[in-house]
Amino acid sequence: MILQDRIKVLNNKKTIDNPYVVYWMQCSQRTEYNHALEYAIMQANELKKPLIVYFGLTDNYPEANERHYYFMLEGLKEVKTELARRNIKMIIRKISPENGALEISSFAALMVVDRGYLRIERKWRTLLAQNAKCSVVQVETNVIVPVEVASIKEEYSAYTLRNKISKRLEEFALPLNERECDEDSTNLELPFDEYDIEDIDKAISQLKIDKTVKRVLYYKGGTSNAKILLEEFISNKLSHYSELKNEPSKTYFSDLSPYLHFGQISPLYIYIKLMDVSIEDKKAFLEELITRRELSMNFVFYNDKYDCYESLPSWALNTLDKHLVDEREFIYSLQELETAQTHDDYWNAAQNEMLITGKMHGYMRMYWGKKILEWSKTPKEAYNTAIYLNNKYLLDGRDANGFAGIAWCFGKHDRPWGERAIFGLVRFMNDKGLKRKFDMERYMHKIESMSYNSAIISDNEKTEQLSLF
Protein backbone atom coordinates (compact mmCIF):
# COMPACT_ATOMS: atom_id res chain seq x y z
CA MET A 1 0.00 0.00 0.00
CA ILE A 2 1.25 3.49 -0.89
CA LEU A 3 -0.05 6.16 1.47
CA GLN A 4 -0.84 9.60 0.08
CA ASP A 5 1.71 11.19 2.44
CA ARG A 6 4.47 9.51 0.42
CA ILE A 7 3.25 11.18 -2.78
CA LYS A 8 3.88 14.81 -3.75
CA VAL A 9 2.94 16.48 -7.04
CA LEU A 10 5.86 18.78 -7.92
CA ASN A 11 4.14 20.99 -10.50
CA ASN A 12 0.64 22.05 -11.52
CA LYS A 13 0.72 20.43 -14.94
CA LYS A 14 -1.53 17.64 -16.10
CA THR A 15 -1.09 14.13 -17.40
CA ILE A 16 -0.87 14.52 -21.18
CA ASP A 17 -1.41 12.31 -24.22
CA ASN A 18 2.13 11.00 -24.69
CA PRO A 19 3.04 7.34 -25.29
CA TYR A 20 4.73 6.38 -22.00
CA VAL A 21 4.79 6.76 -18.26
CA VAL A 22 8.41 7.36 -17.20
CA TYR A 23 9.95 6.64 -13.81
CA TRP A 24 13.19 8.54 -13.28
CA MET A 25 15.10 6.27 -10.92
CA GLN A 26 17.81 8.11 -9.03
CA CYS A 27 17.98 7.60 -5.25
CA SER A 28 16.09 4.30 -5.06
CA GLN A 29 18.13 1.92 -7.19
CA ARG A 30 16.11 -1.24 -6.63
CA THR A 31 13.05 -3.09 -7.87
CA GLU A 32 11.90 -4.44 -4.50
CA TYR A 33 10.05 -2.35 -1.92
CA ASN A 34 10.28 0.69 -4.16
CA HIS A 35 7.14 2.81 -3.72
CA ALA A 36 8.11 5.06 -6.64
CA LEU A 37 8.35 2.10 -9.02
CA GLU A 38 5.10 0.56 -7.82
CA TYR A 39 3.32 3.91 -8.10
CA ALA A 40 4.64 4.32 -11.65
CA ILE A 41 3.39 0.82 -12.58
CA MET A 42 0.00 1.62 -11.08
CA GLN A 43 -0.25 4.85 -13.08
CA ALA A 44 0.93 3.20 -16.30
CA ASN A 45 -1.73 0.51 -15.94
CA GLU A 46 -4.41 3.06 -15.20
CA LEU A 47 -3.44 5.11 -18.26
CA LYS A 48 -3.03 1.94 -20.35
CA LYS A 49 0.49 2.91 -21.31
CA PRO A 50 3.86 1.12 -21.11
CA LEU A 51 6.32 2.11 -18.39
CA ILE A 52 9.90 3.18 -19.07
CA VAL A 53 12.46 3.40 -16.25
CA TYR A 54 15.20 5.96 -16.92
CA PHE A 55 18.54 6.39 -15.14
CA GLY A 56 21.01 9.18 -15.91
CA LEU A 57 24.70 8.44 -15.40
CA THR A 58 26.80 11.57 -15.10
CA ASP A 59 30.57 12.02 -15.08
CA ASN A 60 30.19 14.97 -12.77
CA TYR A 61 28.38 13.83 -9.64
CA PRO A 62 30.08 15.78 -6.83
CA GLU A 63 32.97 13.86 -5.20
CA ALA A 64 32.03 10.48 -6.71
CA ASN A 65 34.82 8.26 -8.07
CA GLU A 66 35.50 4.77 -9.42
CA ARG A 67 34.86 3.17 -6.03
CA HIS A 68 31.35 4.60 -5.85
CA TYR A 69 30.52 4.12 -9.53
CA TYR A 70 31.59 0.47 -9.60
CA PHE A 71 29.41 -0.41 -6.63
CA MET A 72 26.50 1.54 -8.11
CA LEU A 73 26.82 -0.08 -11.55
CA GLU A 74 26.87 -3.54 -9.99
CA GLY A 75 23.50 -2.68 -8.49
CA LEU A 76 22.09 -1.06 -11.64
CA LYS A 77 23.03 -4.08 -13.72
CA GLU A 78 20.90 -6.19 -11.41
CA VAL A 79 18.07 -3.63 -11.52
CA LYS A 80 17.99 -3.73 -15.31
CA THR A 81 17.76 -7.54 -15.29
CA GLU A 82 14.98 -7.56 -12.71
CA LEU A 83 12.99 -4.89 -14.54
CA ALA A 84 13.22 -6.89 -17.77
CA ARG A 85 11.89 -9.90 -15.86
CA ARG A 86 8.88 -7.73 -15.01
CA ASN A 87 8.49 -6.67 -18.68
CA ILE A 88 9.78 -3.14 -18.03
CA LYS A 89 12.39 -1.46 -20.20
CA MET A 90 15.20 0.40 -18.45
CA ILE A 91 17.15 3.08 -20.29
CA ILE A 92 20.53 4.06 -18.86
CA ARG A 93 22.04 7.13 -20.50
CA LYS A 94 25.38 8.85 -20.07
CA ILE A 95 24.01 12.30 -19.39
CA SER A 96 23.46 14.66 -16.50
CA PRO A 97 20.45 13.05 -14.80
CA GLU A 98 18.16 16.08 -14.75
CA ASN A 99 18.85 16.90 -18.42
CA GLY A 100 18.17 13.33 -19.45
CA ALA A 101 14.96 13.33 -17.41
CA LEU A 102 13.84 16.51 -19.11
CA GLU A 103 14.59 15.08 -22.57
CA ILE A 104 12.70 11.84 -21.98
CA SER A 105 9.80 13.76 -20.41
CA SER A 106 8.88 14.96 -23.91
CA PHE A 107 7.67 11.38 -24.51
CA ALA A 108 5.97 11.05 -21.12
CA ALA A 109 2.32 11.28 -20.23
CA LEU A 110 3.48 11.41 -16.61
CA MET A 111 6.89 11.58 -14.91
CA VAL A 112 7.46 9.81 -11.59
CA VAL A 113 10.62 10.34 -9.53
CA ASP A 114 11.85 9.00 -6.20
CA ARG A 115 12.69 11.52 -3.49
CA GLY A 116 16.17 12.83 -2.73
CA TYR A 117 17.15 15.01 0.21
CA LEU A 118 20.54 16.43 -0.69
CA ARG A 119 20.91 19.85 -2.28
CA ILE A 120 21.78 18.65 -5.77
CA GLU A 121 19.02 16.02 -5.79
CA ARG A 122 16.38 18.57 -4.85
CA LYS A 123 17.72 21.00 -7.45
CA TRP A 124 17.42 18.33 -10.17
CA ARG A 125 13.80 17.58 -9.29
CA THR A 126 12.89 21.26 -9.22
CA LEU A 127 14.39 21.76 -12.67
CA LEU A 128 12.40 18.85 -14.10
CA ALA A 129 9.16 19.99 -12.46
CA GLN A 130 9.55 23.52 -13.78
CA ASN A 131 10.41 22.55 -17.36
CA ALA A 132 8.54 19.32 -18.08
CA LYS A 133 5.29 19.69 -20.03
CA CYS A 134 3.60 16.91 -18.08
CA SER A 135 2.82 16.30 -14.44
CA VAL A 136 5.81 15.34 -12.26
CA VAL A 137 5.06 13.25 -9.17
CA GLN A 138 7.60 12.51 -6.43
CA VAL A 139 7.25 9.38 -4.30
CA GLU A 140 9.14 9.07 -1.00
CA THR A 141 10.54 5.58 -0.54
CA ASN A 142 13.98 5.75 1.13
CA VAL A 143 12.68 6.39 4.65
CA ILE A 144 10.00 4.63 6.65
CA VAL A 145 8.24 7.75 7.92
CA PRO A 146 8.32 10.58 5.33
CA VAL A 147 10.60 13.41 6.46
CA GLU A 148 7.98 16.15 6.45
CA VAL A 149 5.46 13.88 8.19
CA ALA A 150 7.92 13.03 10.95
CA SER A 151 8.71 16.68 11.67
CA ILE A 152 8.09 20.13 10.20
CA LYS A 153 11.44 21.49 11.42
CA GLU A 154 15.07 20.61 12.04
CA GLU A 155 15.28 18.47 15.16
CA TYR A 156 17.74 19.14 17.96
CA SER A 157 18.61 15.51 18.65
CA ALA A 158 17.53 11.90 18.30
CA TYR A 159 15.58 12.34 21.53
CA THR A 160 13.34 15.03 20.06
CA LEU A 161 12.64 13.06 16.86
CA ARG A 162 12.24 9.57 18.35
CA ASN A 163 8.76 10.06 19.78
CA LYS A 164 7.52 11.82 16.66
CA ILE A 165 8.58 8.89 14.48
CA SER A 166 7.26 6.32 16.94
CA LYS A 167 3.79 7.85 16.79
CA ARG A 168 3.61 7.41 13.01
CA LEU A 169 5.72 4.28 12.52
CA GLU A 170 2.92 1.72 12.50
CA GLU A 171 0.99 3.84 10.01
CA PHE A 172 3.81 3.78 7.44
CA ALA A 173 5.46 0.41 8.12
CA LEU A 174 3.17 -1.38 5.70
CA PRO A 175 4.16 -4.21 3.35
CA LEU A 176 4.45 -3.21 -0.30
CA ASN A 177 3.17 -5.66 -2.89
CA GLU A 178 4.69 -5.87 -6.35
CA ARG A 179 2.44 -5.04 -9.27
CA GLU A 180 2.61 -6.37 -12.81
CA CYS A 181 2.77 -4.07 -15.82
CA ASP A 182 -0.11 -4.63 -18.21
CA GLU A 183 1.98 -3.39 -21.14
CA ASP A 184 5.34 -4.98 -22.03
CA SER A 185 7.86 -2.22 -22.79
CA THR A 186 11.02 -4.31 -23.15
CA ASN A 187 11.07 -4.21 -26.97
CA LEU A 188 10.27 -0.53 -27.35
CA GLU A 189 12.75 1.65 -29.23
CA LEU A 190 13.33 5.21 -28.08
CA PRO A 191 15.49 7.80 -29.90
CA PHE A 192 18.21 7.88 -27.24
CA ASP A 193 21.69 6.40 -27.08
CA GLU A 194 21.81 3.92 -24.22
CA TYR A 195 24.90 3.39 -22.07
CA ASP A 196 25.93 -0.26 -21.94
CA ILE A 197 26.84 -1.40 -18.41
CA GLU A 198 26.92 -5.14 -19.09
CA ASP A 199 30.72 -5.04 -18.90
CA ILE A 200 31.23 -2.84 -15.85
CA ASP A 201 34.99 -2.48 -16.29
CA LYS A 202 34.45 -1.22 -19.84
CA ALA A 203 31.65 1.09 -18.72
CA ILE A 204 33.87 2.56 -16.00
CA SER A 205 36.76 3.07 -18.44
CA GLN A 206 34.56 5.28 -20.62
CA LEU A 207 33.55 7.58 -17.78
CA LYS A 208 35.57 10.73 -17.09
CA ILE A 209 35.70 10.22 -13.35
CA ASP A 210 38.38 10.07 -10.67
CA LYS A 211 39.89 6.61 -11.09
CA THR A 212 42.54 6.97 -8.38
CA VAL A 213 40.17 5.60 -5.72
CA LYS A 214 39.75 2.01 -6.83
CA ARG A 215 36.80 -0.32 -6.35
CA VAL A 216 36.79 -2.34 -3.16
CA LEU A 217 36.94 -6.12 -2.98
CA TYR A 218 34.98 -6.53 0.24
CA TYR A 219 31.53 -5.40 -0.89
CA LYS A 220 29.64 -6.02 -4.11
CA GLY A 221 26.70 -3.85 -5.07
CA GLY A 222 23.14 -4.96 -5.69
CA THR A 223 19.95 -5.86 -3.86
CA SER A 224 20.71 -9.58 -3.88
CA ASN A 225 23.99 -9.03 -2.03
CA ALA A 226 22.30 -6.66 0.42
CA LYS A 227 19.71 -9.35 1.21
CA ILE A 228 22.44 -11.93 1.79
CA LEU A 229 24.12 -9.59 4.27
CA LEU A 230 20.80 -8.91 5.99
CA GLU A 231 20.07 -12.63 6.40
CA GLU A 232 23.57 -13.22 7.76
CA PHE A 233 23.15 -10.34 10.18
CA ILE A 234 19.81 -11.59 11.47
CA SER A 235 20.99 -15.20 11.76
CA ASN A 236 24.47 -14.72 13.19
CA LYS A 237 24.92 -11.22 14.62
CA LEU A 238 21.68 -9.62 15.75
CA SER A 239 21.43 -11.56 19.03
CA HIS A 240 24.71 -9.97 20.21
CA TYR A 241 24.28 -6.57 18.53
CA SER A 242 23.75 -4.46 21.66
CA GLU A 243 26.67 -6.06 23.46
CA LEU A 244 29.23 -6.13 20.65
CA LYS A 245 28.31 -3.49 18.04
CA ASN A 246 30.82 -1.00 19.47
CA GLU A 247 33.72 -3.50 19.60
CA PRO A 248 36.00 -2.55 16.66
CA SER A 249 37.76 -5.92 16.59
CA LYS A 250 34.48 -7.72 15.90
CA THR A 251 32.01 -7.43 13.03
CA TYR A 252 28.60 -7.37 14.64
CA PHE A 253 27.21 -4.63 12.42
CA SER A 254 25.01 -5.22 9.37
CA ASP A 255 27.27 -3.78 6.62
CA LEU A 256 24.13 -2.43 4.94
CA SER A 257 24.98 1.28 4.93
CA PRO A 258 26.41 1.33 1.36
CA TYR A 259 23.31 -0.46 0.09
CA LEU A 260 21.01 1.96 1.89
CA HIS A 261 23.02 4.88 0.51
CA PHE A 262 22.49 3.80 -3.11
CA GLY A 263 18.91 2.76 -2.44
CA GLN A 264 19.73 -0.86 -3.23
CA ILE A 265 17.73 -2.05 -0.23
CA SER A 266 14.72 -0.50 1.43
CA PRO A 267 14.77 0.43 5.13
CA LEU A 268 11.13 -0.65 5.20
CA TYR A 269 12.05 -4.09 3.88
CA ILE A 270 14.70 -4.41 6.62
CA TYR A 271 12.21 -3.32 9.27
CA ILE A 272 9.57 -5.81 8.16
CA LYS A 273 12.13 -8.64 8.11
CA LEU A 274 13.14 -7.75 11.66
CA MET A 275 9.54 -7.74 12.84
CA ASP A 276 9.50 -11.50 12.23
CA VAL A 277 12.43 -11.98 14.62
CA SER A 278 11.96 -12.39 18.37
CA ILE A 279 15.38 -11.09 19.39
CA GLU A 280 15.57 -8.34 22.01
CA ASP A 281 18.66 -6.79 20.41
CA LYS A 282 16.67 -5.74 17.36
CA LYS A 283 15.56 -2.65 19.31
CA ALA A 284 19.12 -1.31 19.32
CA PHE A 285 19.50 -1.93 15.61
CA LEU A 286 16.14 -0.33 14.80
CA GLU A 287 17.24 2.76 16.73
CA GLU A 288 20.10 3.09 14.23
CA LEU A 289 18.04 2.16 11.17
CA ILE A 290 15.07 4.40 11.91
CA THR A 291 15.69 7.13 14.50
CA ARG A 292 19.34 7.87 13.75
CA ARG A 293 19.14 7.43 9.99
CA GLU A 294 15.96 9.45 9.63
CA LEU A 295 17.39 12.13 11.92
CA SER A 296 20.14 12.51 9.32
CA MET A 297 17.50 12.96 6.60
CA ASN A 298 15.84 15.60 8.77
CA PHE A 299 19.22 17.33 9.13
CA VAL A 300 20.07 17.58 5.42
CA PHE A 301 16.49 18.46 4.45
CA TYR A 302 15.96 21.30 6.92
CA ASN A 303 19.53 22.61 7.25
CA ASP A 304 20.82 24.17 4.02
CA LYS A 305 24.37 24.17 5.44
CA TYR A 306 24.42 20.43 6.19
CA ASP A 307 27.85 19.97 4.59
CA CYS A 308 29.40 23.04 6.23
CA TYR A 309 30.93 23.84 9.59
CA GLU A 310 28.26 26.52 10.04
CA SER A 311 25.58 23.82 10.34
CA LEU A 312 26.62 23.24 13.97
CA PRO A 313 24.51 24.51 16.88
CA SER A 314 25.48 27.90 18.27
CA TRP A 315 26.79 26.47 21.56
CA ALA A 316 29.24 24.25 19.65
CA LEU A 317 30.38 27.05 17.33
CA ASN A 318 30.88 29.39 20.29
CA THR A 319 32.85 26.94 22.43
CA LEU A 320 35.08 25.80 19.56
CA ASP A 321 35.74 29.43 18.63
CA LYS A 322 36.64 30.20 22.25
CA HIS A 323 39.26 27.44 22.18
CA LEU A 324 40.83 28.35 18.83
CA VAL A 325 43.83 29.74 20.71
CA ASP A 326 44.50 26.47 22.55
CA GLU A 327 47.81 24.80 21.79
CA ARG A 328 47.61 21.66 19.64
CA GLU A 329 50.21 19.03 20.49
CA PHE A 330 49.89 17.52 17.01
CA ILE A 331 48.84 19.16 13.75
CA TYR A 332 48.66 17.03 10.62
CA SER A 333 48.33 17.99 6.98
CA LEU A 334 45.58 16.61 4.78
CA GLN A 335 48.10 14.36 3.05
CA GLU A 336 49.32 12.93 6.37
CA LEU A 337 45.77 12.20 7.46
CA GLU A 338 44.73 10.79 4.10
CA THR A 339 47.66 8.36 4.07
CA ALA A 340 47.24 7.38 7.74
CA GLN A 341 50.57 8.87 8.83
CA THR A 342 49.84 9.97 12.40
CA HIS A 343 51.33 9.01 15.76
CA ASP A 344 48.06 7.25 16.71
CA ASP A 345 48.02 3.58 15.63
CA TYR A 346 44.31 3.24 16.38
CA TRP A 347 43.40 6.20 14.21
CA ASN A 348 45.70 5.00 11.43
CA ALA A 349 43.99 1.62 11.49
CA ALA A 350 40.57 3.25 11.13
CA GLN A 351 41.77 5.37 8.21
CA ASN A 352 43.31 2.32 6.56
CA GLU A 353 40.07 0.40 7.04
CA MET A 354 38.33 3.13 5.07
CA LEU A 355 41.00 3.17 2.36
CA ILE A 356 40.92 -0.60 1.91
CA THR A 357 37.28 -1.58 2.41
CA GLY A 358 35.27 1.56 1.72
CA LYS A 359 33.76 1.30 5.21
CA MET A 360 34.80 2.11 8.75
CA HIS A 361 33.62 0.58 12.00
CA GLY A 362 30.89 2.79 13.46
CA TYR A 363 32.54 3.42 16.81
CA MET A 364 35.85 4.20 15.12
CA ARG A 365 34.11 6.72 12.87
CA MET A 366 33.36 8.77 15.98
CA TYR A 367 36.94 8.52 17.25
CA TRP A 368 38.26 9.27 13.75
CA GLY A 369 36.26 12.50 13.50
CA LYS A 370 37.11 13.65 17.02
CA LYS A 371 40.83 13.25 16.40
CA ILE A 372 40.70 15.21 13.15
CA LEU A 373 39.21 18.04 15.22
CA GLU A 374 42.03 17.72 17.76
CA TRP A 375 44.83 17.60 15.16
CA SER A 376 43.79 20.44 12.84
CA LYS A 377 44.71 24.12 12.96
CA THR A 378 41.08 25.16 13.25
CA PRO A 379 37.80 23.31 13.78
CA LYS A 380 36.52 24.56 10.41
CA GLU A 381 39.56 23.08 8.66
CA ALA A 382 38.96 19.84 10.57
CA TYR A 383 35.32 19.77 9.50
CA ASN A 384 36.22 20.24 5.84
CA THR A 385 38.91 17.55 6.08
CA ALA A 386 36.49 15.05 7.60
CA ILE A 387 33.89 15.75 4.89
CA TYR A 388 36.52 15.37 2.17
CA LEU A 389 37.88 12.04 3.42
CA ASN A 390 34.43 10.65 4.24
CA ASN A 391 33.03 11.47 0.82
CA LYS A 392 36.09 10.34 -1.11
CA TYR A 393 36.71 6.91 0.38
CA LEU A 394 33.55 5.59 2.02
CA LEU A 395 31.06 3.70 -0.12
CA ASP A 396 28.34 5.47 1.83
CA GLY A 397 30.06 8.84 1.52
CA ARG A 398 28.03 11.82 0.28
CA ASP A 399 25.12 10.45 2.31
CA ALA A 400 22.85 12.19 4.80
CA ASN A 401 24.04 9.74 7.45
CA GLY A 402 27.66 10.67 6.79
CA PHE A 403 27.01 14.41 6.96
CA ALA A 404 25.14 13.98 10.24
CA GLY A 405 27.82 11.67 11.63
CA ILE A 406 30.58 14.18 11.00
CA ALA A 407 28.50 17.01 12.41
CA TRP A 408 27.95 14.89 15.55
CA CYS A 409 31.71 14.72 16.12
CA PHE A 410 31.64 18.51 16.36
CA GLY A 411 28.59 18.76 18.65
CA LYS A 412 25.54 18.40 16.39
CA HIS A 413 22.69 16.27 17.82
CA ASP A 414 24.62 16.15 21.12
CA ARG A 415 24.75 18.18 24.33
CA PRO A 416 27.50 20.22 26.00
CA TRP A 417 29.96 18.21 28.12
CA GLY A 418 32.71 19.16 30.56
CA GLU A 419 34.98 21.88 29.19
CA ARG A 420 38.51 20.98 28.09
CA ALA A 421 41.25 22.23 25.79
CA ILE A 422 40.56 22.43 22.03
CA PHE A 423 37.15 20.72 22.32
CA GLY A 424 35.61 23.19 24.73
CA LEU A 425 32.21 21.76 25.63
CA VAL A 426 32.16 19.31 22.71
CA ARG A 427 32.31 15.63 23.69
CA PHE A 428 35.89 14.30 23.89
CA MET A 429 37.24 10.85 23.01
CA ASN A 430 40.76 9.50 23.47
CA ASP A 431 42.86 6.42 22.83
CA LYS A 432 42.88 5.45 26.50
CA GLY A 433 39.12 4.98 26.36
CA LEU A 434 39.46 2.70 23.34
CA LYS A 435 42.19 0.64 24.99
CA ARG A 436 40.21 0.32 28.21
CA LYS A 437 36.98 -0.79 26.54
CA PHE A 438 38.07 -2.80 23.52
CA ASP A 439 40.60 -5.25 22.12
CA MET A 440 42.40 -2.67 20.01
CA GLU A 441 45.41 -4.89 19.27
CA ARG A 442 43.07 -7.35 17.62
CA TYR A 443 41.42 -4.53 15.66
CA MET A 444 44.77 -3.31 14.32
CA HIS A 445 45.76 -6.86 13.40
CA LYS A 446 42.47 -7.26 11.54
CA ILE A 447 43.12 -4.14 9.46
CA GLU A 448 46.72 -5.19 8.78
CA SER A 449 45.41 -8.53 7.51
CA MET A 450 42.94 -6.74 5.25
CA SER A 451 45.76 -4.65 3.84
CA TYR A 452 47.85 -7.74 3.13
CA ASN A 453 44.97 -9.64 1.55
CA SER A 454 44.02 -6.66 -0.58
CA ALA A 455 47.56 -6.41 -1.89
CA ILE A 456 47.84 -10.06 -2.95
CA ILE A 457 44.41 -10.59 -4.53
CA SER A 458 44.87 -10.73 -8.29
CA ASP A 459 42.28 -9.71 -10.85
CA ASN A 460 41.57 -13.38 -11.52
CA GLU A 461 40.72 -13.95 -7.86
CA LYS A 462 38.30 -11.05 -7.45
CA THR A 463 35.16 -13.04 -8.19
CA GLU A 464 36.02 -15.64 -5.56
CA GLN A 465 36.81 -12.97 -2.99
CA LEU A 466 33.55 -11.15 -3.61
CA SER A 467 31.52 -14.28 -2.95
CA LEU A 468 32.73 -14.61 0.63
CA PHE A 469 29.88 -12.69 2.30
Regions found by a protein language model. Name each.
Residues 146-312, 438-469:
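Glycine/tryptophan-enriched, flexible segments
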Residues 116-132, 364, 445-458:
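Repeat-unit-sized solenoid/scaffold elements
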Residues 93-109, 131-143, 182-197, 408-414, ...:
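Short secondary-structure transition/capping segments
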Residues 27, 91, 247-446, 450:
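Active-site-proximal binding-pocket segments
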Residues 36, 75, 79, 226-233, ...:
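Alpha-helical packing segments of well-folded alpha/beta enzyme cores
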Residues 66, 70, 217-220, 224, ...:
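Charge-dense, low-complexity intrinsically disordered segments
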Residues 1-176, 281, 352, 371-376, ...:
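Trp/Phe/Arg-rich N-terminal binding region typifying the photolyase-homology
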